[in-house]
Amino acid sequence: MTTTITFFGLSCVPVFHRYADNDRIAILLRTPEGKPVATATVNQPDFNLEPNQVLIKDYAENEGILAALANAGIIEDTGKTVPVGHAQARLCRLLVQPTLH
């Protein structure tokens, strides 16, 4: 069964990939037809992550994406943040076993 979440009023499907430079999990949101909506994660290579952790970009155009993913049971917010440029990404635990595309 495919998980569907609502983000900015759009029905979205989370799609999991890996970042090429360090093999970390990336979460992208797509429409059910496959059109891109948002990239939920950011990659901060200088910060050590556990294999089940991701950094969520919940600011600017992605504001609200943390709540959407958490409400769907995909991630859990640890309450910690990591500096990313001039902003802060949220450190989260994956609650699902990602199927990579």
What are the functions of these language-model segments?
Residues R30-I74:
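Acidic, aromatic-enriched beta-alpha/helix-loop junctions
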Residues D58-H101:
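Short, compact, well-ordered microdomains
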Residues F16, I27, A38-A40, P51-Q53, ...:
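Generic local-structure boundary detector
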Residues M1-A26, K35-A38, N43-P45, Q97-L100:
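Ser/Thr/Pro-rich, acidic low-complexity intrinsically disordered regulatory segments
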